[in-house]
């Protein structure tokens, strides 16, 4: 293959871009940053395995003083101008029975939607609470969202942490276990980005986890620092899709579950044309927290926690479909 230069590589804290030979050197601590991963450039296909985003991250061997992680990219035959973006929030499956409803209700519907839009490339984003604290359901969940006719990405919600542990930033000895560990093993990094068409897509966690279901909706200083660096590679004025679990500007739901430090986030996002996609509330709401920032807080795939067929606001269990054309 040919070396690809200018590809952004990160371990979740430090960043480098590949040189003319496609090489990069990153000083990292694998115990604290267990993966290294790329932000796929728009000129290349989104790497996936059986329709689930994969191959853009690699796990580091903490036992080695040096790891070599190479990534293979496939050049697109032509640039993408139009694509479809599907945001799916809160499948929140607690047990086999709920997973079965997701499999038999949500999944066929997603396949049908994808089939009706098959002239376009489709990107899917699971906005967190993929499971309900049930780490054993990650593998069957991944199986359920495979081969839907789209490239399926995920991010972390408050129910996607292993409740026995705190999040990595609050863990003194990660080798003994940490909250994100199971998620990392199943889906890769918590904060990452990729590019498609004219859009820079970011997925982030905005849950600060204390273990045993206790958490605060907020971005840690480390999260915001990662975002600042990621955005430094994106020209000002470009379109950014930011995907998070907890909303940043919800007004409807009492104590809206909003990320506490949304203003720090808005400062970083202001120079861009931003669409934020969030879940968490099981309630549909759109907000314009700043002139260039639009938030789509979407209802849940599980509705009111699989109790029936509707969300708390009465909208049916479902997901959001966005058609993107150029910068529209």
Segments from the language model and where they lie:
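A short, amphipathic beta-strand motif
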Residues: 1-2, 22, 71
């Amino acid at each position: 293959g040919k070396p690809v230069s200018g590809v952004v590589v990160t371990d979740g804290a430090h960043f480098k871009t590949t040189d003319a030979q496609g090489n990069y050197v990153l000083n990292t601590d694998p115990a604290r940053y267990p993966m290294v991963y790329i932000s796929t450039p728009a000129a290349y296909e989104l790497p996936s395995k059986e329709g689930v985003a994969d191959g853009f991250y690699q796990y580091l061997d903490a036992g080695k003083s040096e790891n070599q992680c190479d990534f293979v990219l496939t050049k697109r035959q032509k640039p993408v101008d139009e694509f479809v973006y599907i945001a799916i929030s809160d499948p929140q499956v607690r047990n086999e029975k709920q997973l079965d409803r997701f499999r038999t209700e949500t999944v066929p519907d997603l396949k049908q939607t994808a089939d009706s839009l098959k002239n376009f490339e489709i990107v899917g984003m699971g906005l967190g609470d993929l499971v309900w604290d049930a780490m054993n359901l990650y593998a069957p969940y991944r199986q359920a969202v495979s081969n839907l006719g789209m490239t399926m990405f995920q991010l972390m919600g408050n129910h996607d942490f292993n409740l026995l542990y705190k999040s990595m930033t609050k863990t003194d000895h990660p080798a003994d276990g940490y909250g994100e560990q199971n998620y990392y093993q199943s889906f890769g990094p918590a904060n990452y980005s990729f590019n498609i068409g004219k859009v820079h897509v970011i997925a982030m966690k905005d849950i600060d986890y204390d273990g045993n279901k206790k958490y605060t909706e907020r971005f840690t200083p480390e999260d915001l620092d990662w975002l600042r660096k990621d955005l430094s590679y994106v020209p000002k004025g470009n379109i950014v899709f930011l995907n998070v679990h907890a909303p940043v500007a919800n007004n409807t739901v009492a104590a809206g579950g909003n990320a506490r430090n949304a203003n720090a986030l808005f400062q970083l996002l202001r120079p861009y044309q931003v669409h934020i996609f969030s879940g968490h509330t099981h309630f549909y709401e759109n907000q314009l927290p700043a002139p260039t920032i639009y938030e789509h807080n979407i209802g849940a795939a599980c509705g009111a926690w699989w109790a029936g067929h509707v969300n708390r606001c009465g909208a049916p269990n479902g997901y959001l479909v966005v058609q993107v054309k150029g910068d529209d």
